[in-house]
């Protein structure tokens, strides 16, 4: 799995 995909798939509960 690509690191970028992982970050994309990661659940972040903070506003961008």
Curated annotation (Swiss-Prot):
<keyword id="KW-0428">Leader peptide</keyword>
<protein>
    <recommendedName>
        <fullName>his operon leader peptide</fullName>
    </recommendedName>
</protein>
<dbReference type="InterPro" id="IPR012565">
    <property type="entry name" value="His_leader"/>
</dbReference>
<keyword id="KW-0028">Amino-acid biosynthesis</keyword>
<comment type="function">
    <text>This protein is involved in the attenuation mechanism for the control of the expression of the his operon structural genes.</text>
</comment>
<dbReference type="GO" id="GO:0000105">
    <property type="term" value="P:L-histidine biosynthetic process"/>
</dbReference>
<dbReference type="Pfam" id="PF08047">
    <property type="entry name" value="His_leader"/>
</dbReference>
<comment type="similarity">
    <text>Belongs to the HisL family.</text>
</comment>
<keyword id="KW-0368">Histidine biosynthesis</keyword>
């Amino acid at each position: 799995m690509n690191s970028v995909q992982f970050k994309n798939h990661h659940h972040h509960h903070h506003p961008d």
